Amino acid sequence: MKFTRLLRGSTTLVAVSALAPVLGCGGAAPEPAAPEMVDAEPVQTSRPSMSSRSEIGGMNEEKVQAAFQRASPRLSRCYEKGVERIPYLGGEIRFKVRVAEDGTARWAFVKDSTLGDRDTEACMLKVLKATRWPKPVGGEGLAENSFTFEPSSDERPPVPWTPDQLGTPYKKARPALESCRSQAGASQLKATLYIDTDGKPLSVGVSSADERGEDAAECVAGALREITFPSPGSYASKVSVDID
């Protein structure tokens, strides 16, 4: 099956404590063959002070970029599997990874995504969790990266929808979706759906504002898959909704 693989993004490296915020930036540059990550302007990170080294860790920028680069072919294979099921699958996905002091991933989650396929997202998370990361210095570290995937230009894109077009079925499902979120202790979630001509979801993807959202993702995706929405007409639609 013919499709275009466009992988682009930027790596954000920070010195962080367990509760420190992360600020990321994105960049873009297409790669015609095997997808490669292209970085935006270098992110400046400060060295931890003597008083804070017990709480925060610094990471070597070049080594973290290299780790994402090594993972990119496997991320692309996850996407290829998704395209086999959904030919017009595409969108941007942003990951956040917490790296333990031994260089393993303590956790990884989808921070934001318009990809719309949980199976593909889960496959990519598995790749990142298995990736060997550079060891942070002075504590644990965080890294973020955004990637954009685009299907072949031969594929007709789905019709864009707004949440209001999901109608009464979605309104009735909101309490169950909010229960998924609250039981996991997560903050805001976002779900992206492809809806077939019969109103049934073809696939559902879920992103979250924090790592606890991963515990809610399958619950949310499962609940949305059971709903029959209004028909989008003669072609599939795509929509994103916030769950908070």
Task: Specify the residue positions occupied by each region the protein language model found.
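Charge-biased low-complexity segments
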Residues: 26-244
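C-terminal motif of bacterial Sec signal peptides marking the signal peptidase cleavage site
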Residues: 21-24
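Bacterial N-terminal signal peptides that target proteins for export
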Residues: 2-18
